[in-house]
């Protein structure tokens, strides 16, 4: 009797695990099917690129296939914010900025979000993004109170330019997983980390001076691993 219970219990748990894995894959397939793997000297990061930001997806894939990020470095770390990188030769690859594809609030700055860097709004009111510089959000976890306070501060400063209050999903993610909500609606988020968020967070805790890492953190190789 006891053995039978254990077997049935084990089968039930395995079924639940398979169901959760299947749902996770379907969820990722809904946002996009292109995956890029970033091999760093701290570990591997896999990102999924969004289909509804096609300009940035295609631009990133093009640069990756040209080897533009192989041998580059993470050159900027903002604590509780993000880690940023560019190409291995900005003079060779930098070009025109890309038109904004801000799909907000569908895509927001949760931990692991991948977005394009850009100039400040005062010189770039159309919020065009860099064609080479990108960042991955590390962020921090908020309490409901601190998140509401931040939202009010953002509204008072008009940094959201009339965008709606945080959705229930945003509130849940920012208070459980964390992120950088103060960046929402201002930058094009074009992908997210699906594997290796711990590596991203580890890089985000590296020692810095004026947001520059004290130790070199290399990107060994970047490749398109799934389409």
Residue ranges and their predicted role:
Residues 22-227:
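Cyclophilin-like peptidyl-prolyl cis-trans isomerases
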């Amino acid at each position: 009797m006891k053995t039978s219970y254990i077997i049935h219990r084990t089968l039930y748990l395995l079924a639940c695990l398979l169901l959760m894995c299947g749902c996770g894959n379907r969820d990722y397939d809904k946002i996009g099917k292109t995956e890029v793997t970033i091999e760093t000297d701290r570990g591997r990061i896999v990102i999924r690129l969004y289909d509804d930001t096609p300009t940035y997806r295609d631009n990133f894939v093009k640069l990756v296939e040209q080897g533009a990020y192989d041998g580059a470095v993470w050159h900027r770390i903002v604590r509780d914010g993000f880690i940023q990188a560019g190409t291995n030769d900005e003079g060779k690859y930098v070009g025109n900025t890309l038109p904004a594809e801000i799909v907000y609030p569908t895509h927001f700055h949760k931990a692991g979000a991948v977005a394009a860097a850009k100039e400040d709004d005062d010189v770039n009111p159309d919020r065009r993004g860099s064609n080479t510089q990108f960042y991955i959000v590390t962020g921090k976890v908020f309490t409901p109170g601190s998140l509401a306070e931040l939202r009010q501060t953002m509204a008072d400063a008009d940094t959201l330019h009339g965008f709606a209050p945080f959705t229930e999903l945003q509130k849940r993610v920012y208070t459980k997983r964390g992120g950088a909500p103060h960046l929402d609606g201002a930058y094009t988020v074009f992908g997210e980390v699906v594997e290796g968020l711990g590596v991203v967070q580890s890089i985000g805790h590296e020692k810095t001076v004026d947001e520059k890492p004290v130790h070199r953190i290399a990107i060994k190789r970047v490749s398109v691993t799934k389409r």
